[in-house]
């Protein structure tokens, strides 16, 4: 098992060298580079990767054109340049919902078709509109004027129930996915007049980033939003309420959260990364308690001892790039370094961060020290994504399947007008993989049959199988032996008593007959 980090830069139209940008995918725990993508640059949050390995795709919004570039994993140049109605500023993907087919049987993610796509692609534009496409058909399912200014961040919840958008107008909107894709409803009026599930207007400056908790229960969904007004706000999506507001000493550019929801990590506009703990130990009761709640405002002071601060992004490079030196661009020395993107590994032990200078670091969260440095980009980092993957899945030799017929790699072109509401016109292009037969040995087959027989006999959903635990087998054997000896003695005494009774009864009958 390995973890792959994908990062991409923003690009600078004024600098011709920065246009020779690359998107990189490298290993966190080794020096292996998994993939590279040429001419890949995008605005902040303007890219999304469906996964790691053969058959996966990268979607990149062009920073200065109304195009979406689509890359296939293992291929450096873009496969498709898809025109869209207007220029997009951010992208996000929604995967297909997982449906449980049968009881006790789960789908095998290793048995994937060579042609596969996620379910939905959503994008936010600079005019404040939300676009939603279905990737398997290319249909445009939704065009919604959601904000007054440019949308800066857009994300689906892990379950796909909600779509959250943040904008420069300082508003954050939560939409139901089912409402946005209701183009096939018979009621056209309801599909046009879509209202947000929740609207949060507590920020006073543009929202720069947001994160959604990966909760197994929908009632536990939490929304984390950050803004240049130096606040981190935590909302409960289902109750539509503000839980906690954290005030930091500087503007916030990005946010990520711990996988176990123990803390948040925010990148500041002064080049620092602050840890925001969500739990603390009460010194009086020694009990772990949550911080904030019920709309409480928590102010985080400066950290002079650097107990919860990462400072490695404030260190400038000793030598500037050669092309900047030749062009005599000395103004870059005076610009402050911003932490633009943050992500975290699967176990929550390493923090991946990118800044406006194009540097990407892997830091240990406990020691707050840099453990690895990736190849730098020539402009600001605009997107970082961490994916867990198998080592053989991302090997270079495994990309030979990309040389198949090009028709099998291309996805349908995106429509520029809304889809036909007639469900009969809804056509999908999908590849159904061959059903993989399960291989089981004779012992597992016997165990499964015995369990089925037990359930059949019980005729109930309660499993009445009993597992004996407790005393050792030697103690049980001695107890049984002692009870057997007592039973033998009682049986012998009863036999003797019965014999005496029969002798006395015969003597009694003999005396009666003589008299």
UniProtKB/Swiss-Prot annotation:
Family: Belongs to the WD repeat IPI3/WDR18 family.
GO biological process: DNA-templated DNA replication; rRNA processing
Organism from which the protein derives: Debaryomyces hansenii (strain ATCC 36239 / CBS 767 / BCRC 21394 / JCM 1990 / NBRC 0083 / IGC 2968) (Yeast)
Protein name per Swiss-Prot or TrEMBL: Pre-rRNA-processing protein IPI3
PANTHER family: WD REPEAT-CONTAINING PROTEIN 18, WD-REPEAT PROTEIN 18
UniProt keyword annotations, A-Z: Nucleus, Repeat, Ribosome biogenesis, rRNA processing, WD repeat
Pfam families the record matches: WD40
Principal subcellular localization: nucleus
Assembly notes: Component of the RIX1 complex, composed of IPI1, RIX1/IPI2 and IPI3 in a 1:2:2 stoichiometry. The complex interacts (via RIX1) with MDN1 (via its hexameric AAA ATPase ring) and the pre-60S ribosome particles.
